[in-house]
A protein has these predicted regions:
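Terminal targeting/low-complexity segments that flank the catalytic cores of oxidoreductases
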Residues: 1-100, 123-134
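Tryptophan-centric aromatic hotspots in well-structured domains and transmembrane helices
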Residues: 95, 99-111
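Alpha-helical transition-metal enzyme core signature, strongest for iron centers
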Residues: 75-83, 106-121
């Protein structure tokens, strides 16, 4: 029973915050600079993998510490899990209103983060691309 009351209180709070969300979303849209993941990838460091006549990844190609690699992979997993976050928020608030617009923009932005992280890790051979996809 307490969990249900907590959910109702949270929903009421989020609904009450919608005017603030709308104001801040509009402010963000006015100052945000559009960016694209491909602009931040060092493509000139890329090489084909064995399937295309290149060389498969080897552990010697790692370029970051274990902590940095783990951090980037966990961040990527979080970005890849976005559809479930989007679904939860969109189910509650729908597509209309400030929360609906925010969740759509947030999902797109986080999707770009995921694309940039994955491309960077694979292009620079910082991680085993096969293990990354498993």
């Amino acid at each position: 029973m307490t969990a249900i009351l907590d959910e109702v209180a949270t929903l009421n709070l989020l609904t009450e915050l919608e005017p603030v969300v709308e104001k801040e979303l509009n402010r963000h849209i006015a100052i945000a600079k559009e960016w694209f993941p491909h602009d931040y990838i060092p493509w000139d460091e890329a090489r084909n993998f064995a399937h295309l006549g290149g060389k498969d990844w080897t552990p010697e190609e790692r370029r970051f510490s274990e902590a940095a690699r783990t951090s980037l992979i966990i961040n990527l997993l979080t970005e890849d899990n976005l559809p479930s976050y989007h679904h939860e928020i969109a189910t509650i608030f729908g597509r209309d209103g400030a929360w609906g617009e925010w969740v759509g923009r947030w999902t797109a932005e986080e999707g770009r983060h995921g694309t940039a992280i994955r491309d960077y890790l694979v292009v620079t051979r910082a991680v085993d691309p096969v293990e990354l996809e498993r």
